[in-house]
Amino acid sequence: MAKMAAALHILVKEEKLALDLLEQIKNGGDFEKLAKKHSICPSGKKGGHLGEFRQGQMVPAFDKVVFSCPVLEPTGPLHTQFGYHIIKVLYRK
């Protein structure tokens, strides 16, 4: 079972925007460019890169998705207390 992961994410306040961004990404949009333009998370400045983190380091709902969704497939929107996330897991190990 994976204990570490690396992921990108885009965090926005509105679900509609999250859905629109996910659609753009699935249609070939550049995840990192969209993160830089739209994400309200400080990681947006780095293209949404969260770096590598341990299982259990993130809020539970985010953690659950990161450690269960398909790798390299944009997933979301996931609602947490921070807003709506679009997540792309780069790897798990």
Swiss-Prot record:
<feature type="domain" description="PpiC">
    <location>
        <begin position="2"/>
        <end position="91"/>
    </location>
</feature>
<keyword id="KW-0963">Cytoplasm</keyword>
<comment type="function">
    <text>PPIases accelerate the folding of proteins. It prefers amino acid residues with hydrophobic side chains like leucine and phenylalanine in the P1 position of the peptides substrates.</text>
</comment>
<comment type="similarity">
    <text>Belongs to the PpiC/parvulin rotamase family.</text>
</comment>
<dbReference type="InterPro" id="IPR023058">
    <property type="entry name" value="PPIase_PpiC_CS"/>
</dbReference>
<protein>
    <recommendedName>
        <fullName>Peptidyl-prolyl cis-trans isomerase C</fullName>
        <ecNumber>5.2.1.8</ecNumber>
    </recommendedName>
</protein>
<dbReference type="InterPro" id="IPR046357">
    <property type="entry name" value="PPIase_dom_sf"/>
</dbReference>
<dbReference type="InterPro" id="IPR000297">
    <property type="entry name" value="PPIase_PpiC"/>
</dbReference>
<dbReference type="Pfam" id="PF13616">
    <property type="entry name" value="Rotamase_3"/>
</dbReference>
<dbReference type="GO" id="GO:0005737">
    <property type="term" value="C:cytoplasm"/>
</dbReference>
<dbReference type="InterPro" id="IPR052204">
    <property type="entry name" value="PpiC/parvulin_rotamase"/>
</dbReference>
<keyword id="KW-0697">Rotamase</keyword>
<dbReference type="GO" id="GO:0003755">
    <property type="term" value="F:peptidyl-prolyl cis-trans isomerase activity"/>
</dbReference>
<keyword id="KW-0413">Isomerase</keyword>
